[in-house]
Amino acid sequence: MLISFLFWNLMKCPLQDHLATIVSSHNVDIVMLAERAVAPDEIESALNKGAIQDFQFFPGENRSEKFVLFSRAGKATLISQFDDYSGSLTVRRLQLPGVLEILIAVVHLPSAINYSEVDQLLASAKLAGDIEQTERDTGIPRTILVGDLNMNPFHPGVASAGALHAVMTKQLAARMERTVKGVSYRFFYNPMWGHFGDRTVGPAGTYHLSAAKPLNYFWNMYDQVLLRPELMYSLQDLQILDSAGIESLVTQNGKPKSSAYSDHLPIFFQLEL
C-alpha cells in the first residue's frame, strides 16, 4: 500500500488554501503541520473543500496542539502514543488495514537563535530517548521521524550516537545499531543528505538564511525525514516542494518566498507499506 505524507512548518501563516492545493495535487494521505495560524477545524475544512477528500483531524494528548495531524478517513488512523511536556514531540501509532503498525514521531525543536549547539544536542538526546521509550512501550521498532529539527544533517544532535544517530546511507543503517564505549545505539537512516545542494532535483534545502557571519551555509536542511532501518527500503519518493499548484513558493532566486508564504519549504514523501 503506497501512502503519501506531507510535513510543513507554516510559520504561523494562514496557508490552509495553499496547503489544500498541495495535498490535492500530490494526493497526500497524511498531513503533518507545525506553527499553524488557524484552528484545526479551519484547516480540516480547507482540506475537504471542493472535492471528496474526507480528511479527519487526529488530536494529540497535548491540547496546545503545536502539531496538527490529518489523515484521509478510512485510509489510516493516527493514535496518540506520547506527547512531551514542551510540545516539541508527538508520537502517533499509524494503523492501516492489513499493514504492520508503525510509529510517526513529529518534531519541532528549538532554533539556534534561542539554543546553543550544546542545548540543541541535549534536546536531541532527550528526543531520542523519548522515541526509544515509546518504541519499547508499544513493541513497535518501525519509526518515522519527521519535522523541523532546526539542525542540519551533519549537526551533532542529528548525527551523534547519543542523539538521533542518523546516517547518510542505507548500507550504514543496515547495521541496525552501533556500539560506542560498550553502549549500543540504534540507527536512523537520513535520506535528506541526498537533497542538499544544486546537483539535486528541486530546492537546495528547506530553509535559506543569509547572515552576516564568517560561517554561513545559506541553504539548510532543517526539515527532515528520518527512518528506522526497518522502514528505509519502503521509501519510494522524497521531494522538497517549491510550488502550490501554479503558485511558486520560492522567489526568482529560488529562496523560500517568506513574505507571502512560509520561510520553510514543505517536504513530501511516499512509503510502500
Predicted segments with their positions:
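Structured beta-strand-rich core segments of catalytic domains in phosphoester-bond hydrolases
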Residues: 30, 34-112
